[in-house]
């Protein structure tokens, strides 16, 4: 817990170091504010990524990266999450660029890749929406839900669990794909559990995921 138990010796061991980045679109999460204030007091340099400069996070961090998310219909926090992740990607690209890890051309190409994702998503969404609706119709009365992923897909599993809590308040669990085989595989009445497994072809765990 960065707000309480994180070793102080790892904070402020050099002037304005390390860089501590806190992310909260609302900026009102109390523990995030506490963590930032503790890190800042210990000598770390703090950056808040938030949509509200006047929030707890906005007032606690030394610098703010302001998010501007257009208003849209109310829904579980998917857009805010995507914008926060995009901000972190862009920040990482910029840090690598100024540190000379790659050229300006490479940095520019990576930014364009991120921008192009919006067009790709717009193209894919209609079919995805139809599929998701069909699955939702089949799964609406499930007792609980499992979300399994490995590597970079593990975060997707975590996000899936969070959205089930937020949207419908049903029991859900996120788990590593390998661990699912050793634990959740033995749960009774699997027909009452909606199980979603991420299986990207470029994931190094792809072969094991297919076995699952």
Q: Where on the chain are the PLM-derived regions?
A:
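Glycine-rich phosphate-binding loops that contact phosphosugars or nucleotide phosphates
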Residues: 1-116, 150, 190-212
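Anionic-ligand anchoring segments at beta-strand to alpha-helix junctions in alpha/beta enzyme folds, i.e.
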Residues: 1-20, 140-190
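A ubiquitous structural signal for well-ordered alpha-helices
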Residues: 35, 117-120, 135, 160
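Short, structured loop/turn "capping" segments at alpha-beta junctions
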Residues: 100-104, 131-132, 171
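Ligand-binding beta-strand-loop-alpha-helix segment within the catalytic cores
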Residues: 112, 116-119, 123-129
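A short, well-structured juxtamembrane/interface segment
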Residues: 124-141
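A general structural signal for well-ordered alpha-helical packing
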Residues: 132, 136, 157-161, 210
């Amino acid at each position: 817990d960065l707000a309480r138990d994180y070793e102080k010796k790892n904070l402020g061991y050099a002037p304005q170091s390390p860089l501590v980045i806190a992310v909260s679109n609302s900026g009102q999460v109390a523990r995030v504010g506490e963590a930032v204030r503790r890190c800042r007091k210990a000598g770390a340099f703090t950056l808040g990524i938030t949509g509200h400069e006047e929030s707890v996070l906005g007032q606690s961090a030394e610098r703010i990266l302001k998010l501007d998310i257009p208003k849209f219909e109310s829904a579980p926090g998917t857009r805010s999450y995507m914008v926060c992740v995009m901000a972190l990607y862009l920040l990482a690209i910029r840090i690598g660029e100024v540190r000379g890890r790659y050229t300006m051309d490479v940095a520019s190409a990576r930014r364009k890749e991120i921008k192009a994702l919006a067009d790709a998503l717009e193209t894919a969404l209609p079919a995805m929406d139809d599929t998701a609706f069909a699955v939702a119709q089949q799964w609406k009365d499930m007792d609980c839900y499992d979300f399994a992923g490995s590597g970079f897909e593990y975060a997707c599993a975590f996000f899936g669990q969070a959205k089930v809590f937020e949207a419908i308040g049903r029991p859900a669990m996120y788990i590593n794909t390998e661990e699912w085989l050793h634990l959740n595989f033995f749960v009774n009445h699997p027909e009452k559990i909606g199980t979603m497994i991420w299986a990207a072809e470029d994931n190094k765990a792809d072969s094991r995921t297919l076995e699952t």
